[in-house]
Amino acid sequence: MTWQFPDRLSTNSALPGPAFSGQPAVDLSSFADFLRRQAPELLPAALGGAQSGPASSSGGTGQLPHGTTIVALKYPGGVVLAGDRRSTQGNMIAGRDVKKVYITDDYTATGIAGTAAIAVEFARLYAVELEHYEKLEGVPLTFAGKVNRLAIMVRGNLAAAMQGLVALPLLAGYDIDAPDPEGAGRIVSFDAAGGWNLEEEGYQSVGSGSIFAKSSMKKLYSQVVDADSAVRVAIEALYDAADDDSATGGPDLVRGIYPTAVTIGAEGALEVPESRIAELAREVIQSRSRADTFGPDAAGGDK
């Protein structure tokens, strides 16, 4: 499944370097393609850069940090993208405050689950890719063009994915060209080969806890009426995922670590304040807690 992709500049064969060595011309509109041909050593190894060390072999992938779980929900007039904060390394917790959701331009954000190093490079390089195109062309990519650009990057990681270095993005955005502003929120999921799917159900999740998160969103999605209710449902979905998936981290009230979330609407992409996420997380935990969670003695009752 693919959109038409007219958002490309003409290639330039007059650039120095590989153009004179018989290689194809450089596509100026793609920063990743330009870098791959002019200075491939600056790219992540999985996307065409220099391979080095044991990380390029399948033998060491089990000890690399991995990140999970990302959820996205559409609401009238926009979309929410949220992620937990835990990364794991084998059966160990590698990090408790990892950022997995990134704003990539004014109207899109990506959340990536999988091998942490590749996932972070995906998000950063994709943001540069969008900015690079806008600077050269003078206008931003259409949402269809953004999807195709990310699909190309994911496909470029296929060789590494076959060795276990998988990183799968979840793209959320607001299509400013949509005829109906209330239904302009978009969620796009990808597979390891670069195939993509535009979600029509209104919610999606990736990562090891995705099956539990999607089940939770399926039950709670009818409660979504605006951005705030969508953020609450996203937090509940991550809480449910953390309850059953050891690689997903739930709200940590002791350390003050909470999921991160981004809302994207007609006003653009905005990070949800941590104070609001903390408030919603406490409400979710309180609503799930038994009356005697801390025992009868905590309330002064008789044994």
UniProtKB/Swiss-Prot annotation:
Positions of the propeptide removed during maturation: 1-67
GO biological process annotation, one example: proteasomal protein catabolic process
Location(s), subcellular: Cytoplasm
Keyword flag Cytoplasm: yes
Organism superkingdom: Bacteria
Gene3D superfamilies in UniProt: Glutamine Phosphoribosylpyrophosphate, subunit 1, domain 1
Catalytic activity field: Cleavage of peptide bonds with very broad specificity
Pathway(s) this gene product operates in, as recorded in its UniProt entry: Protein degradation; proteasomal Pup-dependent pathway
Annotated Pfam families: Proteasome
Keyword Cytoplasm: yes
Main localization (coarse): cytoplasm
Signal peptide: none
UniProt-annotated catalytic positions: 68 (nucleophile)
Name the record gives this protein: Proteasome subunit beta
Higher taxonomy: Bacteria, Bacillati, Actinomycetota, Actinomycetes, Mycobacteriales
Name of the coding gene: prcB
